[in-house]
Amino acid sequence: MDYSFDTTAEDPWVRISDCIKNLFSPIMSENPGHMPLQPNASLSEEDGTQGHPDGNPPKLDTANGTPKVYKSADRSTVKKGPPVAPKPAWFRQSLKGLRNRASDPRGLPDPALSTQPAPASREHLGPHIRASSSSSSIKQRISSFETFGSSQLPDKGAQRLSLQPSSGEAAKPLGKHEGGRFSGLLGRGAAPTLVPQQPEQVLPSGSPAATEARDPGVSESPPPGLQPNQKTLPTGSDPLLRLLSTQTEKSQGPVLKMPSQRARSFPLTRSQSCETKLLDEKTSKLYSISSQVSSAVMKSLLCLPSSLSCAQTPCIPKEGASPTSSSNEDSAANGSAETSASDTGFSLNLSELREYTEGLTEAKEDDDGDHSSHQSGQSVISLLSSEELKQLIEEVKVLDEATLKQLDSIHVTILHKEEGAGLGFSLAGGADLENKVITVHKVFPNGLASQEGTIQKGNEVLSINGKSLKGTTHNDALAILRQAREPRQAVIVTRKLTAESMPDLNSTTDSAASASAASDVSVESSAEATVYTVTLEKMSAGLGFSLEGGKGSLHGDKPLTINRIFKGAASEQSETIQPGDEILQLAGTAMQGLTRFEAWNIIKALPDGPVTIVIRRKSLQPKETTAAADS
C-alpha cells in the first residue's frame, strides 16, 4: 500500500480538509531553492522570504517548482511512519514548527532573526534532508503569515520610543531600541524627561552641570515642557514615565508657588464674603468689613517674622498710631506682671478700630476702655497697609447709624500660639444642621481663648484667619478651625449674639426660640414629670422618631426630646412614646449633656432588635404650648 502524498485515499478516522491539503501538499511546498545542500543558498532564500514587509509569501515555490524529480526521495522519507497513523507525519512536523515559532517573534523585535538558525540545523539532518526542507518551507509560510499579522509591531515600538520629548535622536543611541535598556534608562532618572529642551545634555540628576542647566529655566521652561509630555502619554503607556513626570511636578510645585498658596489661603479681597448669600444688606456690610480686617491682619502677621508675643512684631504707626504708643505697647508687653496676657494675644471691637481709622486720637477720653484696648487698636492699625486702610475707611463711612451700633458686638481677636496648637474652643452649628449660625460650642479652661478672655460660649464666629464661616457646613467650619493650628498667629472675628442683634440675623429663629421658651416655662410650672421605661424595636431605618434639642442646639443647651414620630413605624403603632418626651437613657447610656449628633450616632450603632429607652413625660401637657414649640 502506498502512503505517499500523491495517493487519493484518506484516513477513515481523520478528516483532513481541502485547504490543509492544498497548503501542505509536496507540490506546493517544493522549490529548487531549498534543495541544494549549500548553506549560503538556503540562507539567501530565507532572507528573501522574510524580507517582505507586507508579509506576502514568496511565489518561487509554485512558479519554478519541479517536484517530480524528487518525488522518490520524498516517498522514502515519509513512509517511515506506522501503517495506520492518527495524523500524517508532515502534519505533526508542522505543529512542532508552530510551537517552536510561537515564542520567537515576541521575544525578538525583528521577526527575520527568528528563522536564521534553521539552515544550520538543516545541514546536520543527513538522510532526512527532504523532510526537513518540506518542514522548513512550512515554517517559512507560517513565519510569513506571522510577519503579516505582526507587521505593525515595529511601528508600536517606534511609538513607544517616541514618547520621550523632542530629544528623540539623542535617546535612540542610549536605548538601542531594546525594551530592557529603555526601561532601565527611565529607572535611572529619565534625564530627557526632566530637561526636554536640551537633548544634547543628557547628564545624571546629581551632577552639577545638570543643575546649572536647569536653574535658568526653573520658573518658565519646565512647566511648559512637562505639559505636552503628559498630553502625549496614552492610557496604556509606561506607568513609570507617568510617575516620574508627576513626581517632578510635585517636587517643583511647593518651591515655585509658595506666595500664591499663601495668597489663596488668606485672600486680600472680599470674594468669600461677597459670594455668600446674606439675609440683609446691613449684615453683608458687617461681614465684609470683618472679613476684610481679619484677612488683612492675618496676611500682615504672616509676612512679619514669626513670634510668640505681639511686642516682637515691628509696628509701623499710621493714622493716629504714634511711635510713643508703640513703645508703650512694647514696655507693657515686656512687663513681668502681664507677660501671660500679652503672650496670649489681644482683641478689640470694630467700633474702636473705626475710631482709629477716622483719626480720632482723642478716643481715650471718650471711651471707658483701659489703656491696653487702645494699644491693641493701634497695633491692629499698624498691621494694615495704607491701601487696606483707605478701603476700610471708605466702607465705614457708608454705613448708617444702626449698622454702626452693631460694630460694638463684633470683636477681632488675635491669638499668639505655638505651631500645631489649638485655638482653645470648639464650634457648633452649620448650614447643614438645625442651627444655621456657627457659634462657639465650648471654651476649654486652659486654652488660648480662655486665657485671652474675649471669645465666650455662644458667640457667633464670623471668620477664622480670613476665611468666612457664613453659610458653611459644619464639616467645612471644622476644617477651617483645624487649618488654624499651623500658623503661629490666629485671627478670629466673633460676634456677641445680643437681643438687639438677633432680629437682624435670624428673626424667624428668634421668634421660635421665644415661643419654645414660653412653652417650657408654662409646662414646667404646671406639670409634674413621670419617668417611663419603654421597649422599642430597632430596625434598619432606626427607632422611628426624630430628635430635637441637645447640647449646643439652636435654643441653647436643652434636653434631648422626641420631635416627630415617623408614619408606619413600630413606635407609632404601639403609642408608647409621644412627641415631647425627654430621653434620659438609651440602651443603658445616659443621654444628658449630649448633642443631637452624638445621640444619633449612639442610635445608629445599636444592633437591630429590642431597645430599652427611659423617657420622662410631663403628666400635664398643654396642647397650645406644645404646638407653639413644634412650630
Curated annotation (Swiss-Prot):
GO annotation terms (biological process): induction of positive chemotaxis; leukocyte chemotaxis
Polar residues biased stretches: 322-344
Pfam families: PDZ (PF00595)
Key word Membrane present: no
Chain residue ranges for the region called Disordered: 30-269, 317-344
Superkingdom of this protein's organism: Eukaryota
Modified residues (Phosphoserine): 221
InterPro entries named among the record's database cross-references: IL-16 (IPR020450), IL-16-like (IPR055287), PDZ (IPR001478), PDZ_sf (IPR036034)
Chain segments carrying region Interaction with PPP1R12A, PPP1R12B and PPP1R12C: 405-501
Domain called PDZ: residue spans: 411-496, 533-618
A molecular function (GO) term: CD4 receptor binding
Regions of compositional bias (Low complexity) in chain numbering: 132-144
Classification via SMART domains: PDZ
UniProt keyword annotations, A-Z: Chemotaxis, Cytokine, Cytoplasm, Nucleus, Phosphoprotein, Repeat, Secreted, Transcription, Transcription regulation
Function text: Interleukin-16 stimulates a migratory response in CD4+ lymphocytes, monocytes, and eosinophils. Primes CD4+ T-cells for IL-2 and IL-15 responsiveness. Also induces T-lymphocyte expression of interleukin 2 receptor. Ligand for CD4. Pro-interleukin-16 is involved in cell cycle progression in T-cells. Appears to be involved in transcriptional regulation of SKP2 and is probably part of a transcriptional repression complex on the core promoter of the SKP2 gene. May act as a scaffold for GABPB1 (the DNA-binding subunit the GABP transcription factor complex) and HDAC3 thus maintaining transcriptional repression and blocking cell cycle progression in resting T-cells.
Quaternary data: Homotetramer. Pro-interleukin-16 interacts (via PDZ 2 domain) with PPP1R12A, PPP1R12B and PPP1R12C. Pro-interleukin-16 interacts with GRIN2A. Pro-interleukin-16 interacts with GABPB1. Pro-interleukin-16 interacts (via PDZ 3 domain) with HDAC3.
The protein's name: Pro-interleukin-16
Lineage start: Eukaryota, Metazoa, Chordata, Craniata, Vertebrata
Name of the gene: IL16
